Amino acid sequence: MAENAYSKAGVDVEAGYQVVERIKKHVARTERIGAMGALGSFGGMFDLSSLNLKEPVLVSGTDGVGTKLLLAIEADKHDTIGIDCVAMCVNDILAQGAEPLFFLDYIATGKTDPVKMEQIVKGVADGCEQAGAALIGGETAEMPDMYGADDYDLAGFTVGAVEKQKLITEGAVQAGDTLIGIPSSGIHSNGYSLVRKIFFKDNEFTLDAEISELDVPLVEELLKPTRIYVKPVLEVLKEVTVHGITHVTGGGFVENLPRMLTNDLAVKVELGSWPMLPIFDVVKKYGQLNEMEMYEIFNMGIGMVLAVAKSDVEKTLEVLVQNGEAAYVIGEVTTRESNAVIFAGGKKG
């Protein structure tokens, strides 16, 4: 009787049960040392003592995917958007030197489609595997009065740990440090309200539009998952004293690079020191944006930046390459005279 009444209110309890069964195999893939309990418990659990840290500091992060979700919904492609959600969270706590331990997701939708929900959680689990984090819990909320039947929102939450003496804070970066950039896969998960306006409103492209500068259809390019930098950067942290890390997200170079600096420092970025991905030229062209706007909004092909002493540059590059990462020396830290970010060198973009 109660279930029938709930169904009449638009909530499909049976579909929720189906989702749980469908996602179990994906959650199981993310198991790691320290993870405790079973799917369906009231709370997710993690045994911090399993890490053998002397003075553990917990670092937490939460984020969503923004309006990139609208492209996934319109394209009916849901199996990678979860990677974006994980990436946005774990890359942020990595900037403090933390190893991601576990992850939880939150999905709100107008109508629970078990197949779609499984695809979303599959992506979350894929991201957790890349990050080495256990998926220990989550919530799927069916709210027909708040969302359309095909609509959903996705958010994530992660917790990591680092030894207190190895915690990375803005006070460690010094004038003379070298900036090492690690490439992005594309736009990642920021700036999509503008990107969607440029391509689909102002220029009326279709999702499957073929643009000469791109080697895949437009929507495929725009849905490329955000890269997860956890494993290669953790390897660097074992070998090198990294002074600062920036996750280049919303606000691009201009807003994010200063976040690892004290007020007396600036960064000098050598333009042309890394390969520019074609998607940024395409966005600039069709959006009629200037150079500074691009660097204020997008990652411009660099998703993470490490600040290291000059004496550690060679070792840092070596470890990254050994772990399958391309990496580029893209600039240096200087004393600040005016702007916190200075662009110099070759052609912008």
From Swiss-Prot:
<dbReference type="GO" id="GO:0006164">
    <property type="term" value="P:purine nucleotide biosynthetic process"/>
</dbReference>
<protein>
    <recommendedName>
        <fullName>Phosphoribosylformylglycinamidine cyclo-ligase</fullName>
        <ecNumber>6.3.3.1</ecNumber>
    </recommendedName>
</protein>
<keyword id="KW-0067">ATP-binding</keyword>
<dbReference type="GO" id="GO:0005829">
    <property type="term" value="C:cytosol"/>
</dbReference>
<dbReference type="InterPro" id="IPR004733">
    <property type="entry name" value="PurM_cligase"/>
</dbReference>
<dbReference type="GO" id="GO:0004641">
    <property type="term" value="F:phosphoribosylformylglycinamidine cyclo-ligase activity"/>
</dbReference>
<dbReference type="InterPro" id="IPR016188">
    <property type="entry name" value="PurM-like_N"/>
</dbReference>
<dbReference type="InterPro" id="IPR010918">
    <property type="entry name" value="PurM-like_C_dom"/>
</dbReference>
<dbReference type="Pfam" id="PF02769">
    <property type="entry name" value="AIRS_C"/>
</dbReference>
<dbReference type="GO" id="GO:0005524">
    <property type="term" value="F:ATP binding"/>
</dbReference>
<keyword id="KW-0547">Nucleotide-binding</keyword>
<keyword id="KW-0963">Cytoplasm</keyword>
<dbReference type="GO" id="GO:0046084">
    <property type="term" value="P:adenine biosynthetic process"/>
</dbReference>
<dbReference type="GO" id="GO:0006189">
    <property type="term" value="P:'de novo' IMP biosynthetic process"/>
</dbReference>
<keyword id="KW-0658">Purine biosynthesis</keyword>
<comment type="similarity">
    <text>Belongs to the AIR synthase family.</text>
</comment>
<dbReference type="InterPro" id="IPR036921">
    <property type="entry name" value="PurM-like_N_sf"/>
</dbReference>
<comment type="pathway">
    <text>Purine metabolism; IMP biosynthesis via de novo pathway; 5-amino-1-(5-phospho-D-ribosyl)imidazole from N(2)-formyl-N(1)-(5-phospho-D-ribosyl)glycinamide: step 2/2.</text>
</comment>
<dbReference type="InterPro" id="IPR036676">
    <property type="entry name" value="PurM-like_C_sf"/>
</dbReference>
<dbReference type="Pfam" id="PF00586">
    <property type="entry name" value="AIRS"/>
</dbReference>
<dbReference type="GO" id="GO:0004637">
    <property type="term" value="F:phosphoribosylamine-glycine ligase activity"/>
</dbReference>
<keyword id="KW-0436">Ligase</keyword>
